[in-house]
Amino acid sequence: MDNLGESPTDKGGEPGESEETRATPGALVAADTEGIPEETDRDGDADLKEAAAEESELKSQDVSDVTAAERENSSLLTPAAKKLKLDIKDKKEKKQKVDEDEIQKMQILVSSFSEEQLNRYEMYRRSAFPKAAIKRLIQSITGTSVSQNVVIAMSGISKVFVGEVVEEALDVCEKWGETPPLQPKHMREAVRRLKSKGQIPNSKHKKITFF
Protein backbone atom coordinates (compact mmCIF):
# COMPACT_ATOMS: atom_id res chain seq x y z
CA MET A 1 0.00 0.00 0.00
CA ASP A 2 2.76 2.37 0.84
CA ASN A 3 4.39 1.51 -2.42
CA LEU A 4 1.15 2.05 -4.24
CA GLY A 5 0.70 5.43 -2.50
CA GLU A 6 4.15 6.50 -3.25
CA SER A 7 4.13 5.41 -6.86
CA PRO A 8 1.69 8.04 -8.11
CA THR A 9 3.70 10.80 -6.54
CA ASP A 10 6.88 9.24 -7.81
CA LYS A 11 5.42 8.72 -11.23
CA GLY A 12 3.97 12.21 -11.18
CA GLY A 13 7.28 13.62 -10.12
CA GLU A 14 9.20 11.67 -12.67
CA PRO A 15 7.23 12.95 -15.63
CA GLY A 16 7.54 16.52 -14.35
CA GLU A 17 11.21 16.11 -13.99
CA SER A 18 11.52 14.51 -17.39
CA GLU A 19 9.57 17.34 -19.00
CA GLU A 20 11.73 19.88 -17.29
CA THR A 21 14.87 18.03 -18.20
CA ARG A 22 13.63 17.62 -21.74
CA ALA A 23 12.60 21.26 -22.01
CA THR A 24 15.73 22.73 -20.50
CA PRO A 25 18.18 21.46 -23.19
CA GLY A 26 16.02 22.97 -25.92
CA ALA A 27 15.80 26.22 -24.06
CA LEU A 28 19.53 26.18 -23.50
CA VAL A 29 20.19 25.45 -27.17
CA ALA A 30 17.81 28.23 -28.21
CA ALA A 31 19.46 30.62 -25.80
CA ASP A 32 22.85 29.63 -27.09
CA THR A 33 21.80 29.96 -30.70
CA GLU A 34 20.22 33.34 -30.03
CA GLY A 35 23.32 34.62 -28.24
CA ILE A 36 25.88 33.46 -30.79
CA PRO A 37 24.94 35.85 -33.64
CA GLU A 38 25.01 38.85 -31.33
CA GLU A 39 28.47 37.93 -30.15
CA THR A 40 29.69 37.25 -33.68
CA ASP A 41 28.25 40.57 -34.89
CA ARG A 42 29.96 42.42 -32.10
CA ASP A 43 33.20 40.60 -32.77
CA GLY A 44 32.93 41.41 -36.50
CA ASP A 45 32.32 45.10 -35.79
CA ALA A 46 35.27 45.16 -33.44
CA ASP A 47 37.46 43.47 -36.04
CA LEU A 48 36.38 45.96 -38.71
CA LYS A 49 37.08 48.87 -36.40
CA GLU A 50 40.50 47.48 -35.54
CA ALA A 51 41.30 46.89 -39.23
CA ALA A 52 40.20 50.44 -40.11
CA ALA A 53 42.31 51.84 -37.29
CA GLU A 54 45.33 49.84 -38.42
CA GLU A 55 44.82 50.94 -42.04
CA SER A 56 44.54 54.59 -41.02
CA GLU A 57 47.70 54.25 -38.95
CA LEU A 58 49.52 52.68 -41.91
CA LYS A 59 48.31 55.43 -44.25
CA SER A 60 49.36 58.15 -41.84
CA GLN A 61 52.74 56.47 -41.46
CA ASP A 62 53.14 56.21 -45.25
CA VAL A 63 52.20 59.87 -45.67
CA SER A 64 54.64 60.89 -42.98
CA ASP A 65 57.35 58.78 -44.64
CA VAL A 66 56.64 60.36 -48.04
CA THR A 67 56.66 63.87 -46.62
CA ALA A 68 59.88 63.12 -44.80
CA ALA A 69 61.44 61.78 -48.00
CA GLU A 70 60.26 64.85 -49.93
CA ARG A 71 61.71 67.08 -47.27
CA GLU A 72 65.01 65.22 -47.46
CA ASN A 73 65.05 65.49 -51.27
CA SER A 74 64.12 69.17 -51.14
CA SER A 75 66.80 69.78 -48.56
CA LEU A 76 69.30 68.06 -50.83
CA LEU A 77 68.19 69.99 -53.95
CA THR A 78 67.54 73.28 -52.20
CA PRO A 79 70.85 75.02 -53.00
CA ALA A 80 70.76 74.18 -56.71
CA ALA A 81 67.06 74.94 -56.97
CA LYS A 82 67.47 78.23 -55.17
CA LYS A 83 70.40 79.18 -57.38
CA LEU A 84 68.45 78.30 -60.52
CA LYS A 85 65.42 80.27 -59.36
CA LEU A 86 67.58 83.25 -58.49
CA ASP A 87 69.32 83.11 -61.88
CA ILE A 88 66.01 82.95 -63.73
CA LYS A 89 64.61 85.76 -61.62
CA ASP A 90 67.70 87.91 -62.21
CA LYS A 91 67.56 87.28 -65.95
CA LYS A 92 63.89 88.21 -66.07
CA GLU A 93 64.49 91.36 -64.07
CA LYS A 94 67.48 92.33 -66.23
CA LYS A 95 65.57 91.67 -69.43
CA GLN A 96 62.60 93.66 -68.17
CA LYS A 97 64.89 96.49 -67.15
CA VAL A 98 66.65 96.48 -70.54
CA ASP A 99 63.32 96.46 -72.35
CA GLU A 100 62.08 99.35 -70.26
CA ASP A 101 65.31 101.28 -70.90
CA GLU A 102 65.08 100.62 -74.64
CA ILE A 103 61.46 101.74 -74.72
CA GLN A 104 62.30 104.88 -72.78
CA LYS A 105 65.25 105.68 -75.06
CA MET A 106 63.12 105.09 -78.14
CA GLN A 107 60.40 107.36 -76.81
CA ILE A 108 62.94 110.12 -76.15
CA LEU A 109 64.46 109.65 -79.61
CA VAL A 110 61.10 109.69 -81.38
CA SER A 111 59.98 112.75 -79.44
CA SER A 112 63.08 114.60 -80.66
CA PHE A 113 62.46 113.73 -84.33
CA SER A 114 61.54 116.38 -86.79
CA GLU A 115 58.49 115.86 -88.96
CA GLU A 116 60.59 114.61 -91.86
CA GLN A 117 62.57 112.23 -89.65
CA LEU A 118 59.39 110.94 -88.06
CA ASN A 119 57.88 110.23 -91.47
CA ARG A 120 61.04 108.41 -92.54
CA TYR A 121 61.04 106.38 -89.34
CA GLU A 122 57.42 105.39 -89.80
CA MET A 123 58.06 104.38 -93.42
CA TYR A 124 61.10 102.34 -92.41
CA ARG A 125 59.25 100.64 -89.56
CA ARG A 126 56.37 99.64 -91.81
CA SER A 127 58.48 98.65 -94.80
CA ALA A 128 59.42 95.04 -95.49
CA PHE A 129 60.83 93.04 -98.36
CA PRO A 130 58.45 90.57 -99.98
CA LYS A 131 59.33 87.16 -98.62
CA ALA A 132 58.56 85.41 -101.89
CA ALA A 133 61.17 87.51 -103.72
CA ILE A 134 63.74 86.90 -100.97
CA LYS A 135 63.06 83.16 -101.14
CA ARG A 136 63.51 83.08 -104.92
CA LEU A 137 66.75 85.05 -104.62
CA ILE A 138 68.17 82.70 -101.98
CA GLN A 139 67.17 79.61 -103.97
CA SER A 140 68.72 81.01 -107.15
CA ILE A 141 72.02 81.62 -105.33
CA THR A 142 72.23 78.46 -103.24
CA GLY A 143 70.39 76.12 -105.60
CA THR A 144 68.47 74.53 -102.72
CA SER A 145 65.15 75.16 -101.04
CA VAL A 146 65.18 77.02 -97.72
CA SER A 147 62.81 77.10 -94.78
CA GLN A 148 60.51 79.96 -93.89
CA ASN A 149 62.63 80.90 -90.89
CA VAL A 150 65.64 81.49 -93.13
CA VAL A 151 63.54 83.67 -95.43
CA ILE A 152 62.29 85.75 -92.48
CA ALA A 153 65.83 86.18 -91.12
CA MET A 154 67.24 87.22 -94.50
CA SER A 155 64.36 89.62 -95.03
CA GLY A 156 65.12 91.33 -91.72
CA ILE A 157 68.87 91.47 -92.42
CA SER A 158 68.22 92.94 -95.87
CA LYS A 159 66.01 95.62 -94.36
CA VAL A 160 68.72 96.59 -91.87
CA PHE A 161 71.36 96.63 -94.63
CA VAL A 162 69.28 98.89 -96.88
CA GLY A 163 68.56 101.19 -93.93
CA GLU A 164 72.29 101.58 -93.22
CA VAL A 165 73.04 102.33 -96.89
CA VAL A 166 70.27 104.94 -97.04
CA GLU A 167 71.47 106.61 -93.83
CA GLU A 168 75.03 106.76 -95.17
CA ALA A 169 73.75 108.14 -98.48
CA LEU A 170 71.86 110.87 -96.64
CA ASP A 171 75.06 111.79 -94.79
CA VAL A 172 76.90 111.94 -98.12
CA CYS A 173 74.20 114.14 -99.58
CA GLU A 174 74.42 116.49 -96.59
CA LYS A 175 78.23 116.66 -96.72
CA TRP A 176 78.16 117.48 -100.40
CA GLY A 177 75.82 120.36 -99.72
CA GLU A 178 72.98 118.80 -101.63
CA THR A 179 69.40 118.16 -100.68
CA PRO A 180 67.30 115.01 -101.02
CA PRO A 181 65.91 113.09 -102.84
CA LEU A 182 68.82 110.71 -102.99
CA GLN A 183 70.51 110.06 -106.30
CA PRO A 184 72.48 107.03 -107.54
CA LYS A 185 75.76 108.83 -106.93
CA HIS A 186 74.86 109.24 -103.27
CA MET A 187 74.08 105.53 -103.00
CA ARG A 188 77.32 104.51 -104.74
CA GLU A 189 79.37 106.74 -102.46
CA ALA A 190 77.56 105.37 -99.42
CA VAL A 191 78.35 101.78 -100.46
CA ARG A 192 81.99 102.71 -101.09
CA ARG A 193 82.31 104.27 -97.63
CA LEU A 194 80.67 101.33 -95.92
CA LYS A 195 83.03 98.96 -97.72
CA SER A 196 86.01 101.00 -96.63
CA LYS A 197 84.76 100.79 -93.04
CA GLY A 198 84.41 97.02 -93.36
CA GLN A 199 80.64 97.07 -92.84
CA ILE A 200 79.96 95.54 -96.27
CA PRO A 201 81.80 92.37 -97.34
CA ASN A 202 83.61 92.55 -100.65
CA SER A 203 81.73 90.54 -103.26
CA LYS A 204 84.67 90.34 -105.66
CA HIS A 205 86.73 87.16 -105.43
CA LYS A 206 90.41 87.76 -104.84
CA LYS A 207 92.89 85.05 -105.65
CA ILE A 208 95.33 84.62 -102.80
CA THR A 209 98.80 83.59 -103.86
CA PHE A 210 101.22 81.92 -101.51
CA PHE A 211 104.98 82.54 -101.80
UniProtKB/Swiss-Prot annotation:
It comes from the Eukaryota. InterPro entries: Histone-fold, TAF11-like, TAFII28_dom. GO terms for cellular component: nucleus; transcription factor TFIID complex. The keyword Nucleus applies. The keyword Ubl conjugation does not apply. Its main location: nucleus. Residues 1-74 are annotated as: Disordered. GO terms for molecular function: DNA binding; protein heterodimerization activity. The modification N-acetylmethionine is found at residue 1. It is found in: Nucleus. GO terms for biological process: mRNA transcription by RNA polymerase II; positive regulation of transcription initiation by RNA polymerase II; RNA polymerase II preinitiation complex assembly. Pfam families: TAFII28. Residues 8-22, 43-73 have a biased composition (Basic and acidic residues). The TFIID basal transcription factor complex plays a major role in the initiation of RNA polymerase II (Pol II)-dependent transcription. TFIID recognizes and binds promoters with or without a TATA box via its subunit TBP, a TATA-box-binding protein, and promotes assembly of the pre-initiation complex (PIC). The TFIID complex consists of TBP and TBP-associated factors (TAFs), including TAF1, TAF2, TAF3, TAF4, TAF5, TAF6, TAF7, TAF8, TAF9, TAF10, TAF11, TAF12 and TAF13. TBP and TAFII18 bind to distinct domains of TAFII28. Component of the TFIID basal transcription factor complex, composed of TATA-box-binding protein TBP, and a number of TBP-associated factors (TAFs), including TAF1, TAF2, TAF3, TAF4, TAF5, TAF6, TAF7, TAF8, TAF9, TAF10, TAF11, TAF12 and TAF13. Interacts with TAF13 both in vitro and intracellularly; also interacts directly with TBP. This is Transcription initiation factor TFIID subunit 11. It comes from Mus musculus (Mouse).
